[in-house]
């Protein structure tokens, strides 16, 4: 009896979401177009990083070769962006990576993904609000900070911030109110701020190339003079790549986080007029624009000023001052505030929508899924998430939580890539995701014979009898995916994830052992890499789904596997404290899921009700 109950619990945790076949039905307002999505993605991604991150990475990690670091980071981000793009075309519903996981790998993994996305967006909102407050305070002479230190100091070092940030709370309250008014209104404000930000960045790039000198990319150790009093700081060996290629890779790992934010586009599936095409285009276009901006600003910055003289906290004003053009700091300040505003809006925009999607599915408390009849926005979810973010911005220094935000985002990226890999090789399922990917015109052209054929394939009437053997794995006879080939891919994907984790652990924790040629490290690394290649080859040999989508990830399974590897490798770079905080957050989440979500899940209600026959499912999709 105990084994039976345990098996039933396992089936509950791995049940997959049945997606409604109707593309048009949505309780939210469909008012966004492709341009709105590009503006949202650029605004969310092209935030504070372009004004601060470039200086820190150039001085401490890569030097002028930061342009290559941004290129590598952009390529890694595009891998994740392509996977998001395919799922945006396949499942144009609100929920982003949470929904993608739900329809592919099951309820428990979906809850883990959604729970970590909520954490990432809340921390992102709080940290950017404090950065906006600090930037504005710096611009007007720091009166807000001085007042807080004199009258509102918090005596809890190591636990709370030195002073509460009232202005950050006010900013969050204003933007929360803006988001509750409606998507169209908030999208308009976002477009205005994004346009100003892009114009300022164009000014910076053009000025940098005009005022800069290529000699700053050809420096030697003899030029290390402006900071010669600081003997503890290392400036590398000069030249274009002063810290070597390892410094470029280290800089790329940091620059990767500058591209985080495009995933907010995927949360707008039920608010976009043509989601199957608009979401993939919005993701890829926003990443391309952001890369051009990062590349141009970092090149201009290192051309205007020697990399070892850059100010880590405010590199751009320092570079213009170095060129004798101190007045340009006001343009930089305006651009910085606009960038922080769009980044803040980009963090706040998807936050209530993920909560809404999870609450509507019954995994979070149902009242969070209520929609305002006039504005067609999830008002309660918006206000609740905004209140939590405001409290965190008011009380906490968020330096230690930045990595925690990254771990949640990287986990979501990894799961989306795994979902693309698995779903591409599964048999067609008209009552789930397959019909969701088809347009209305295509559905009209599908006749009953095609649907019956797909149904027979699902229920096991395969054109070729399949038995488990090495030949059936390496050289399958079926042209279309079957239950057997889908099972092979599922098992292979799980094994591949374990092997990639092993490779990343050895590469990060056993770096010195590998460098010294220690036998165990070399053996484990070599064996794991070879097995990864073998398993990837097995997946590649399986028949691929012929479902027509408006966008598909190219070079499957190689690109999703590369995306998973990059994301897990970056997760392994995070410190132990981050993993401990991650475990605490997950403990809270599991308490909610096993105490409430698993029993109130909409999929559980469907399973407890009448079981739908294949014929009824076909009728629903017709």
UniProtKB/Swiss-Prot annotation:
Carrying Phosphoserine, the residues are 616
- Where does the sequence pass through the membrane? 36-57, 62-82, 103-123, 163-183, 192-212, 240-260, 281-300, 331-351, 378-398, 402-422, 486-506, 520-544, 553-573, 578-598
Query: How does the entry describe its membrane topology?
Result: Multi-pass membrane protein
Pull one GO CC term from this UniProt entry.
membrane
Subcellular location(s) per record: Cell membrane
UniProt keyword Kinase present: no
Single GO term (MF): L-ornithine transmembrane transporter activity
Which family does the similarity line name?
Belongs to the amino acid-polyamine-organocation (APC) superfamily. Cationic amino acid transporter (CAT) (TC 2.A.3.3) family.
The free-text function statement in the UniProt record for this protein reads: High-affinity, low capacity permease involved in the transport of the cationic amino acids (arginine, lysine and ornithine) in non-hepatic tissues. (Microbial infection) Acts as a receptor for the ecotropic murine retroviral leukemia virus.
Quaternary organization: Interacts with TM4SF5; the interaction is negatively regulated by arginine. Forms tissue-specific complexes with ASL, ASS1 and nitric oxide synthase NOS1 or NOS3; the complex regulates cell-autonomous L-arginine synthesis and citrulline recycling while channeling extracellular L-arginine to nitric oxide synthesis pathway.
Name it.
High affinity cationic amino acid transporter 1
Supply the gene name: Slc7a1
């Amino acid at each position: 009896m105990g084994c039976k109950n345990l098996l039933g619990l396992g089936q509950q945790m791995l049940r997959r979401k049945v997606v409604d076949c109707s593309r048009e039905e949505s309780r939210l307002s469909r008012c966004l177009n492709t341009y709105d999505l590009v503006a949202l993605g650029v605004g969310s991604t092209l935030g504070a990083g372009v004004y601060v991150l470039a200086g820190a990475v150039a001085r401490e990690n890569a030097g002028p070769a930061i342009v290559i670091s941004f290129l590598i980071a952009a390529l890694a981000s595009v891998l994740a962006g392509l996977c998001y793009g395919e799922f945006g075309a396949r499942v144009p519903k609100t929920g982003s990576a949470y929904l993608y996981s739900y329809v592919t790998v099951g309820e428990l993994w979906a809850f883990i993904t959604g729970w970590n996305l909520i954490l990432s967006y809340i921390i992102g909102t709080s940290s950017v609000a404090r950065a906006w407050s600090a930037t504005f305070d710096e611009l007007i002479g720091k009166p807000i900070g001085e007042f807080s230190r004199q009258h509102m100091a918090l005596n809890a070092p190591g636990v709370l911030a030195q002073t509460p940030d009232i202005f950050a709370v006010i900013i969050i309250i204003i933007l929360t109110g803006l988001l509750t008014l409606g998507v169209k209104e908030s999208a308009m404000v976002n477009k205005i701020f994004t346009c100003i930000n892009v114009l300022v960045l164009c000014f910076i790039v053009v000025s940098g190339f005009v005022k800069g000198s290529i000699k700053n990319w050809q420096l030697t150790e003899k030029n290390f003079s402006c900071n010669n009093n600081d003997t503890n700081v290392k400036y590398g060996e000069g030249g274009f790549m002063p810290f070597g290629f390892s410094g470029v890779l280290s800089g790329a790992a940091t620059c990767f986080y500058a591209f985080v934010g495009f995933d907010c586009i995927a949360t707008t599936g039920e608010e976009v007029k043509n989601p199957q095409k608009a979401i993939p285009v919005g993701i890829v276009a926003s990443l391309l624009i952001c890369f051009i901006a990062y590349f141009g600003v970092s090149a201009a910055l290192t051309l205007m000023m020697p990399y070892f003289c850059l100010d880590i906290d405010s590199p751009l004003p320092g570079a213009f001052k170095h060129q004798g053009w101190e007045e340009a700091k006001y343009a930089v300040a305006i651009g910085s505030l606009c960038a922080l505003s769009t980044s803040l809006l980009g963090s706040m925009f998807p936050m209530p929508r993920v909560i809404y999607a999870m609450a509507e599915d019954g995994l979070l408390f149902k009242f969070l899924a209520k929609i305002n009849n006039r504005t067609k926005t999830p008002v309660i979810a918006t206000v609740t998430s905004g209140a939590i973010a405001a409290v965190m911005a008011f009380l906490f220094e968020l330096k230690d939580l930045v990595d925690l935000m990254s771990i949640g985002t990287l986990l979501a990226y990894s799961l989306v890539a795994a979902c693309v890999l698995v779903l591409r090789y599964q048999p067609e399922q008209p009552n789930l995701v397959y019909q969701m990917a088809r347009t209305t015109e295509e559905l009209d052209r599908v006749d009953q014979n095609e649907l019956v054929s797909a149904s027979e394939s699902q229920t096991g009437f395969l054109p070729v009898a399949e038995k488990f053997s090495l030949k059936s794995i390496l050289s399958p006879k079926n042209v279309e995916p079957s239950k057997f080939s889908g099972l092979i891919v599922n098992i292979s994907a799980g094994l591949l994830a374990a092997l990639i984790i092993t490779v990343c652990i050895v590469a990060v924790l056993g770096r010195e052992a590998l460098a010294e040629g220690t036998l165990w490290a070399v053996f484990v690394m070599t064996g794991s890499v070879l097995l990864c290649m073998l398993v990837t080859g097995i997946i590649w040999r399986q028949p691929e789904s012929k479902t027509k989508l408006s966008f598909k990830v190219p070079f499957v399974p190689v690109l999703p596997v590369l995306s998973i590897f990059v994301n897990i490798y970056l997760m392994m770079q995070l410190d132990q404290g981050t993993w401990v905080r991650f475990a605490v957050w997950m403990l809270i989440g599991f308490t909610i899921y096993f105490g409430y979500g698993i029993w109130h899940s909409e999929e559980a209600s469907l399973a407890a009700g009448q079981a739908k026959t294949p014929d009824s499912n076909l009728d629903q999709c017709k």
